[in-house]
Amino acid sequence: MLSWVEKYRPKSLKDVAGHEKVKEKLKTWIESYLKGETPKPILLVGPPGCGKTTLAYALANDYGFEVIELNASDKRNSSAIKKVVGHAATSSSIFGKKFLIVLDEVDGISGKEDAGGVSELIKVIKKAKNPIILTANDAYAPSIRSLLPYVEVIQLNPVHTNSVYKVLKKIAEKEGLDVDDKTLKMIAQHSAGDLRSAINDLEALALSGDLSYEAAQKLPDRKREANIFDALRVILKTTHYGIATTALMNVDETPDVVIEWIAENVPKEYEKPEEVARAFEYLSKADRYLGRVMRRQNYSFWKYATTLMTAGVALSKDEKYRKWTPYSYPKIFRLLTKTKAEREILNKILKKIGEKTHTSSKRARFDLQMLKLLAKENPSVAADLVDYFEIKEDELKVLVGDKLASEILKILKEKKKLERKKKKEKEKLEKEKKKEEKAKEKQSNLIIQPKEIKEEVKAEVEKKEEVKEKIVEKPKAEEVKEKSKTEEKETKKDKKKGKKKKEDKGKQLTLDAFFK
């Protein structure tokens, strides 16, 4: 049993709800193929349920083309695309029919399973002789960015609520449902432009047997979160105040982020210089209110900023531009991402300066600028400051660049070397000084002062006198007299002996006398 979505899928373009201008473009495009021309493939971009695939099949049916489809459920890697799409792009069916190739949800071609898919698809497009229609929810998906130059992008908007209601009304009549218009309109409102979801919801209520208005109210709200590209498209395409101001309602971004997106893409969309000038005048005013939000922490200013950056910019142009514009990611965000590491390093330096100088980050930032200036004008002084603030090599390179950093570090290295040398010399002198002091102290312990010498000599003399008195006592008179008599006797005796020897010497010594 077919679902109602498939059962009531339009077989012809005239039965497709809405998208009148898109249908005309598709007719012109397919007819150029029938004339032997080979225009660029079409990329239909729009939210889920807006009728992208239905349009492709209805177009093929109207012009007698056989559809070759490759959707998200199929493998779409390099070999699969080459095998299926590559062959169909350059040949016809056995019945002589031409092929219309439909690649559904090409923005989902990514990951290992689909490796090389987009690259192979570009090769196929370059050689294709048959028409190719691609569909995507998001034309700005990174996975298909390289594909955009080779296709013509056609933007589809969500199906209008009235168009959804009309389709539901027809289905209800064909199915014989007893349902009032109020309930059908509620289902249409809940769909948020997703016709497929609306048909599924009606079928679910019919199967449940409850087609009341209350049951329709309980249906899940299918409002999708709009991405920033959807919001940009609304703001930059419309000239209606009310539509522009509601463009950001479902966007999960703060005004300070949105303003960067708008500023980046205004010059891409607006063609007249005066329009661009007016738009940036409104953006400038919006930015002032955002500044007040930051300074005063008063978020009520956001509503003024939002109105200026949406309605103000939208009404700056003289006319709507029907062209498709490839909107860009803000360069400032790419730059901030690129310089994130550098900014973290600068914040570290600011913290070091603040801690050393006991100042605020604002004042430290001023000191940082002075340090950068000194690095150019007086690298020697800058080297001292780098040392004082304990700034590392990688931090210095971010601050002043590699060349200046190398020069300052070289100076600092020489200064450090000189300091170490001076320190060693100082330590050496201190050691020698201490050595001399110790030697003097030792010598001073050996040398006695004059007063001490006098006292010691006196004490020594007294000591010697005492010893002398004990050893050498004065002799008595009798002992002296007796000693002199003894000496006289010894003297006389010695004289007699000497006389006798003299006489003996003069006599002849005989043998008898010799032996006697």
Swiss-Prot record:
Gene3D superfamilies: 1.10.8.60, P-loop containing nucleotide triphosphate hydrolases (3.40.50.300). Residues 426-443, 474-493 have a biased composition (Basic and acidic residues). Keywords: ATP-binding, DNA replication, Nucleotide-binding. Transmembrane segments: none annotated. ATP binds at G46, P47, P48, G49, C50, G51, K52, T53. Residues 422-445, 474-516 are annotated as: Disordered. GO terms for biological process: DNA replication. GO terms for molecular function: ATP binding; ATP hydrolysis activity; DNA clamp loader activity. Belongs to the activator 1 small subunits family. RfcL subfamily. Part of the RFC clamp loader complex which loads the PCNA sliding clamp onto DNA. HAMAP family: RfcL. Heteromultimer composed of small subunits (RfcS) and large subunits (RfcL). This is Replication factor C large subunit. It comes from Methanocaldococcus jannaschii (strain ATCC 43067 / DSM 2661 / JAL-1 / JCM 10045 / NBRC 100440) (Methanococcus jannaschii).
